[in-house]
């Protein structure tokens, strides 16, 4: 973070553009006892989510004439670099929309307000512990969590049944069950599973808690990597399903999750692992005769846990109106609003009450009940607080995992490359 600042200081042209876009952190209209105006930089990029956000903000503005919120529509592309520039230039918005995996460095550098005292006991109890942990840095709550995703197995029910496999039901299923299902369904030129793993690191790290995997110990630049049985279990399983069982359509391992939906739609694979939000795309884009289901959350030896990386709302510590901004966050994340936002984005609400409300409304719709239930198992993970994680993910882990899945290196070499790469990152 510190080394980035020297480079950022030279970016005066970009800084001036951002200053024009975001103003000076809530000054507008606040002089002489007039109404306070808070800037809210929203990264929502789906039309339905943008509309839901604007509706929530509109309701707040109508009810709070003395504290008005102005939405500044941004986007996820280069969001991290934009925020670095804004914070260093003093032009960051009052309210910052981002994600748990990215806010740690900003909190560590003192850019985010401590919201602990504004978070009511009722709301604190409504947020699952693992999710709240993901937005807690040095014992300070630095964001309100809003939306989550999990990884879900979507299945072509007809293909599974035709293969002689029994479609799993119940609260959870096991990875051994998934492997056997894929083997059983691999026949007659069709594969049991398609899994878009062109960028496998985020998936493997997020799903490691089910195997007891942590990957990292410590925080910030002091975080140390750990690559043992719990971390290697899922990559090894995927490798074996591909190289030994031949139950994964090989090309999907080189594709994104979205691209891997095409063979699922075409009936080439019986199952596909996807981000839970893809349920909306499957419902919209799949052939009408595709009878698809969302299978129960997958449990490993340590249960069905997955790492939570919620979208977040934080308050700029330098805002002149931290208290008013925190009150807006409390309103934005109430049960009704969170349920509406997550329905629009096809995501999982970060509070129990909003998740229950959405399940009550949409639980009968295909896939929703299972997806929402998976939210119960989302937990915190150390990678969220490892300072060099993003660089390690892109420059070390992803190419190493790709080589391993392509059978170019063995498991021991993979583990060594992951560990050695962590030590070399940032040097």
Language-model-detected regions and their locations in the chain:
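Extracytoplasmic/periplasmic solute-binding protein
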Residues: 138, 142-146, 151, 176-224, ...
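A structural signal for short loop-to-beta-strand junctions that line the ligand-binding cleft
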Residues: 93-94, 123-159, 181, 192, ...
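Mature extracytoplasmic/periplasmic domains
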Residues: 277-280, 311-391
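Conserved N-terminal structural module of periplasmic/extracytoplasmic solute-binding proteins
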Residues: 2-105, 124, 167, 301-302, ...
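Glycine-centered hinge/linker elements that transmit conformational signals in sensory
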Residues: 182-184, 222-252
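Extracytoplasmic/periplasmic substrate-recognition and gating elements
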Residues: 62, 163, 240-246, 284-347, ...
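C-terminal capping/gating helix-and-loop segments adjacent to ligand/active sites or protein-protein/ligand interfaces
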Residues: 369-422
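Hinge/lid segment of periplasmic solute-binding proteins
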Residues: 100-151, 177, 207, 291-295, ...
